[in-house]
Amino acid sequence: MNWQSERIWIELITGSRKTSNFCWACILFLGSLGFLLVGTSSYLGRNLISLFPSQQILFFPQGIVMSFYGIAGLFISSYLWCTISWNVGSGYDLFDRKEGIVCIFRWGFPGINRRIFLRFLMRDIQSIRMEVKEGLYPRRVLYMEIRGQGAIPLTRTDENFTPREIEQKAAESAYFLRVPIEVF
């Protein structure tokens, strides 16, 4: 979502609260819970899941391995749920032509650096850089090249932009900031 006037441009950034992350967290949780229940039922010798008799799976080695996969999956699932609840990666980009400043804000993981806030002058922006890699897994990322600080990404690496969309976004950013576009 964007909001733009003649002098101010605010772009809201979606973090980890995406539909795909919710789906993967649910699938991983349910799958790992199933693995853990099968491993536990083979250890106890009881049917905790009524799909098949527990006597078909021996505890050693299949039950131990399934329990291990279930526990590992629950850890990964809890990590995904934590990143979703903390909304890691969300924030905004603020470009203020009137004040001549650019502010980039992102939420991180809990701790000292939970709030990531970058602020610099518009006159320090050298260019908008587009990095395009084609192939089996195409990657199109937009960077803002800043004097003395290097390149700061404006788009996520996992966003799948079409060539037309990334060009449009680069052109809008370069036009608003009045800087050139570089393509790598």
Curated annotation (Swiss-Prot):
A Pfam short name: Ycf4
- Protein's membrane topology: Multi-pass membrane protein
Keyword list, A-Z: Chloroplast, Membrane, Photosynthesis, Plastid, Thylakoid, Transmembrane, Transmembrane helix
Q: What is one process in the GO biological process aspect for this record?
A: photosynthesis
Q: Which InterPro entries match?
A: PSI_Ycf4_assembly
Stretches that traverse the bilayer: 22-42, 57-77
Q: Where in the cell is it found?
A: Plastid, Chloroplast thylakoid membrane
One Gene Ontology cellular component term attached to this UniProt record is: photosystem I
Q: What does this protein do?
A: Seems to be required for the assembly of the photosystem I complex.
> Matching HAMAP family, A to Z?
Ycf4
Query: Which protein family is named in the record?
Result: Belongs to the Ycf4 family.
Its recorded name reads Photosystem I assembly protein Ycf4
Encoding gene per record: ycf4
